[in-house]
Amino acid sequence: MTGISLPPELQRVHMVGIGGAGMSGVARILLDRGGLVSGSDAKESRGVVALRARGAEIRIGHDASSLDLLPGGPTAVVTTHAAIPKTNPELVEARKRGIPVILRPVVLAKLMTGYTTLMVTGTHGKTTTTSMLIVALQHSGFDPSFAVGGELGEAGTNAHHGSGTTFVAEADESDGSLLEYTPNVAVVTNIEADHLDFFGSEQAYTAVFDSFVERIAPGGALVVCTDDPGAAALADRTDALGIRVLRYGSTGDNLAGTLLSWEQQGTGAVAHIRLAGEHNPRAVRLSVPGRHMALNALAALLAAREIGAPTDSVLDGLAGFEGVRRRFELVGTAAGARVFDDYAHHPTEVRATLEAARTVVDQNGGRVVVAFQPHLYSRTATFAHEFGAALSVADQVVVLDVYAAREQPMAGVSGATVADHVTAPVTYVPDFSAVAAHVASIARSGDVILTMGAGDVTMLGGEILSELRLKDNRGMPGAGAS
């Protein structure tokens, strides 16, 4: 939207950890709105390369002198909540110089000032639902600004400064930062215990969603999935606040949108829905598999309709939705097996993705093979049993060691902690460099192979394809055979 200038403190910004999914999106919007941006990151990445091409000055590695990448220095330094330690030399130097240090969610909230804002949150499905909503609005004649935690297949980016008056964003609940926002339309996909390392208890985690809903702007609405017990309870509590609630799901009373049925078609699906006030069902065609994707699409439809998007154009937009990077993303095919990559790192996400894979593979008589990398020692310890049960949906399971991210190792917790609870055939492979060859050795033609997790397991897809091609060329058992 033209006519809204950047706040003075955001006109010259240095960003610590600029290559991350959330940070790079904010940087892109700042640049597109005429701001000057510098930054630093621990390593080169696609995000860093893309931002440099748009004019950002970026240094690899962290050093106090990076604050001088912009002539005259920055008006603010932006950082994230947990990934960047307070001892980072650039943050130390900023405080020494008296330069304000601002968290990313605060910056995003400032960038949304003056817009009609639609925000999506929940334990699972945030990125995909946000992306579906963006694509639906674009197809309906809107040009929304947006910031999302993944790369849209259609746009090839995670953020955009649009010409319209609408801003769509993903609201991350993991650190409570969603309380920086005041949405006009809020979508809550589900609520289930997670991020207990930050919140300390399930009750504290759940409470942040109540606080978020209380921040909905006057005249706004909550779109919420009542198939999920946690979200359904939130809807009931929200009724008492006088906020308009649009419920969606497959069962329940007073639903604004009902998922009647869905059926798998190739790697996509067709969902049949009924909207409140309409007698005849409608069909929603999707290129992504799984019942959970049908529910995400229904949420996007209801949210888009709230700001005037025509139903038919929204449905057409959803039919063209190509997915999000690292959400059941096809990496390639070799030796008759298809390799997908997925970000799932919570038991519920793991189960939903594997069940979606099951519907795809059952059409071809193959098997579901998953290489799963647990993410965070605290999450692994808390949900080891649940991870084991979810992974057991697959036919063959390979468990990697834990991706620590920001955490220190925890005694007695490893990938084996998860593998011990898997009832399907399972192998624990702690040596990362050996995983691709092992997966290829057990794969058969017709299989769907998934690399799964929020860490560097995403790097393995290409390696598995290479190993499968070698296996196929050598005529080893299993290659090219069902």
From Swiss-Prot:
Pathway: Cell wall biogenesis; peptidoglycan biosynthesis. ATP binds at G122, T123, H124, G125, K126, T127, T128. It catalyses: UDP-N-acetyl-alpha-D-muramate + L-alanine + ATP = UDP-N-acetyl-alpha-D-muramoyl-L-alanine + ADP + phosphate + H(+). SUPFAM superfamilies: MurCD N-terminal domain, MurD-like peptide ligases, catalytic domain, MurD-like peptide ligases, peptide-binding domain. It is an enzyme of class 6 (ligase). Its EC number is 6.3.2.8. GO terms for cellular component: cytoplasm. One of its GO terms (biological process) is peptidoglycan biosynthetic process. It holds the Pfam family Mur_ligase. Keywords: ATP-binding, Cell cycle, Cell division, Cell shape, Cell wall biogenesis/degradation, Cytoplasm, Ligase, Nucleotide-binding, Peptidoglycan synthesis. One of its GO terms (molecular function) is ATP binding. It is found in: Cytoplasm. Transmembrane segments: none annotated. Cell wall formation. Belongs to the MurCDEF family. This is UDP-N-acetylmuramate--L-alanine ligase. It comes from Mycolicibacterium smegmatis (strain ATCC 700084 / mc(2)155) (Mycobacterium smegmatis). The gene is murC.
